[in-house]
Design a protein with these regions (language model features):
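Conserved functional hotspots at enzyme active or ligand-binding sites that engage polyanionic ligands
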Residues: 1-123
Length: 123
């Protein structure tokens, strides 16, 4: 597949499991908006591909007891406040929307996120 041919890796190439500050505007409906952290969930070969897209989950500091969310506590992922990963809000964004790398989540947290995505998508 042409879109999976890799580009040269640069310091700004996101890696699966990293949290980045991203600009998600403009949005529609109930999509998360504004500048906010996002968790990269796409595989690294895709992240380095000519597609110039990355698959992310928005992160919010508005904590709600919703079963498909995953709670992260600082300093995990470079976050400063307790936050929820919105597994129900998976989306592809242009890598141009990524502003700053904040950090990486622990393998255990990523495993929980992966389980929630599997349930949501019926995989």
């Amino acid at each position: 597949m042409e879109f999976l041919k890799s580009k040269a890796r640069s310091d700004t190439t996101p890696t699966r499991g990293e949290i980045w500050l991203a600009d998600l505007d403009p949005t529609r409906g109930h999509e998360q908006a504004g500048r906010r952290p996002v968790l990269v969930v796409s595989e690294d070969p895709f992240n380095r591909s000519k597609a110039d897209l990355v698959i992310v989950l928005p992160v919010t500091s508005t904590l709600r007891p919703i079963p498909f969310r995953v709670r992260l506590s600082p300093p995990e992922g470079g976050l400063k406040v307790e936050s929820d990963v919105l597994c129900e809000a998976i989306r592809s964004i242009s890598k141009d929307r990524l502003l700053t790398r904040l950090g990486s989540v622990q393998m255990e947290s990523m495993a929980v996120v992966e389980d929630r995505i599997r349930i949501l998508l019926g995989l």
